[in-house]
Design a protein with these regions (language model features):
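Nucleotide-sugar donor-binding/catalytic module of glycosyltransferases
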Residues: 1-162
Length: 162
């Protein structure tokens, strides 16, 4: 496996209904550089674990699964996957999220490579609430600006960067 320029950080716990779409959106990325997908599987009790290991078997040059022996919780899972990432850059896509743009990694990496004075890029996203079926479009509603409270971009209001 080539050293990746970008590591896609994905944590998951009981995301069986969503995990395939999350992984497929990463695998569909069109890039001119190598990237990896590092999945932190935290002892899911549904079929998530089997799904991520199946993908890892089918895409061994791209996907690495770091599986818990016992549930460690979201924070510890998040941190250990950061440490497992080997890329110069880290992109986040949680196991119940997905990207719409198949060139997301290429665009963001091109920007960072051509602007070494920047250390973070993010993109707007829609939030979908499964229980109500409601979507909040353009959650950040900013262009080329850091929101007033940039730490909330990282936290994603409880979700992580998208």
């Amino acid at each position: 496996m080539q050293t990746p320029l970008v590591s896609v950080h994905m944590i998951t716990y009981n995301h069986e209904p969503y995990i395939r779409k999350a992984i497929d959106c990463v695998l569909s990325q069109k890039t001119n550089f190598p990237f990896e997908l590092v999945i932190g599987e935290d002892c899911s009790t549904d079929g998530t674990r089997e799904i991520v290991f199946d993908y890892a078997r089918r895409f061994p040059d791209i996907i690495r699964v770091i599986a818990s022996d016992q549930n460690v919780g979201m924070k510890k899972n998040f941190v250990r996957i950061i440490h497992a990432c080997r890329g110069k850059y880290i992109a986040y896509c949680e196991g119940d999220d997905h990207w719409h743009d198949s060139e997301k990694l290429q665009k963001q990496t091109d920007f960072l490579e051509s602007h070494p004075d920047y250390g973070l890029v993010y993109s707007d996203h829609n939030r979908y609430f499964e229980k109500t079926g409601k979507t909040i479009p353009r959650f950040y509603q900013t262009t080329n600006q850091i929101p007033p409270d940039p730490i909330n971009v990282f936290r994603g209001w409880g979700k992580g960067l998208h």
